[in-house]
Amino acid sequence: MSETAKKVIVGMSGGVDSSVSAWLLQQQGYQVEGLFMKNWEEDDGEEYCTAAADLADAQAVCDKLGIELHTVNFAAEYWDNVFELFLAEYKAGRTPNPDILCNKEIKFKAFLEFAAEDLGADYIATGHYVRRADVDGKSRLLRGLDSNKDQSYFLYTLSHEQIAQSLFPVGELEKPQVRKIAEDLGLVTAKKKDSTGICFIGERKFREFLGRYLPAQPGKIITVDGDEIGEHQGLMYHTLGQRKGLGIGGTKEGTEEPWYVVDKDVENNILVVAQGHEHPRLMSVGLIAQQLHWVDREPFTGTMRCTVKTRYRQTDIPCTVKALDDDRIKVIFDEPVAAVTPGQSAVFYNGEVCLGGGIIEQRLPLPV
């Protein structure tokens, strides 16, 4: 580290990963400060609202490490740039991924700008399980060392410029190591469970929460053969490949296998189901993606061989990618894939390197 230590602002969520990130950066000689972002205005007293507890934990960690904790409210930015689009996608019958949008608009845009302009930061840091590597003057996004926790899928919209201004200390570690460091340091977050639920909104009852903002429109549930076997409470509550929560568990036909959502007919408000998690109607040979983001920001032309994930924690799928125009690509899988879901993201890899990705516009069904 140079004589004048570089200043890093760590996004402190009140969790173990950001806590340990701050300590690791201190050990590396950086001048470290924390920032707690409030991105949702609580409108109830439900137990799912944990912002106050998270702030208290973040403050306790910063006090223990001897660093300053700043706070900022990005609720307006979150509503305008993340939540409204999230609702619009659900209304259109698609299944969006708010965490990806939140990283794009809040953590690596609003936070990055605030840290640089208002707090004089040289870098920001987060507790994401990813790594960066600088190659040929550009910063690359790499998978986290812990393949169980790798979060590169959620960060594919970042540009090489944003990655160059970001540090990911826990990306070089495995989760048990991170927890052990926190325990050894006596941090209050050491045994805190990992957060789940919608980015920044927390662990609310999703159906109830969504119902506040979008009116439910009940409709028919039909089989692939056209038989009506039930009623859904709203297409927005269902996604392709879903098994639980359909309310038709006792309905037996044919194979007696469980029912899965295989299609959503938005125009007619109909949910289509079939039996078996590998039913041909659930399988796709490829997809069309749009709203492309390539980490190196170079336009993609021609074709390439790589691997793709169509959802988080999925095993990499070998595929061929072909450019259709500036902002659309066609992806053909080597083998058919189940539950490819419009609105979700397709993220591409070359080995450890995350190349970028796009939003799934449509799936290319298996010919039957």
From Swiss-Prot:
Keywords: ATP-binding, Cytoplasm, Disulfide bond, Nucleotide-binding, RNA-binding, Transferase, tRNA processing, tRNA-binding. The active site is at 102 (nucleophile), 199 (cysteine persulfide intermediate). Coiled coil: none annotated. Pfam families: tRNA_Me_trans, tRNA_Me_trans_C, tRNA_Me_trans_M. It catalyses: S-sulfanyl-L-cysteinyl-[protein] + uridine(34) in tRNA + AH2 + ATP = 2-thiouridine(34) in tRNA + L-cysteinyl-[protein] + A + AMP + diphosphate + H(+). One of its GO terms (biological process) is tRNA wobble position uridine thiolation. Disulfide bonds join 102-199. ATP binds at residues 11-18, 37, 127. InterPro entries: MnmA-like (IPR004506), MnmA-like_C (IPR046885), MnmA-like_central (IPR046884), MnmA-like_central_sf (IPR023382), Rossmann-like_a/b/a_fold (IPR014729). Residues 149-151, 311-312 are annotated as: Interaction with tRNA. Catalyzes the 2-thiolation of uridine at the wobble position (U34) of tRNA(Lys), tRNA(Glu) and tRNA(Gln), leading to the formation of s(2)U34, the first step of tRNA-mnm(5)s(2)U34 synthesis. Sulfur is provided by IscS, via a sulfur-relay system. Binds ATP and its substrate tRNAs. PANTHER family: MITOCHONDRIAL TRNA-SPECIFIC 2-THIOURIDYLASE 1 (PTHR11933:SF5), TRNA 5-METHYLAMINOMETHYL-2-THIOURIDYLATE -METHYLTRANSFERASE (PTHR11933). Belongs to the MnmA/TRMU family. This is tRNA-specific 2-thiouridylase MnmA. It comes from Shigella flexneri. The gene is mnmA.
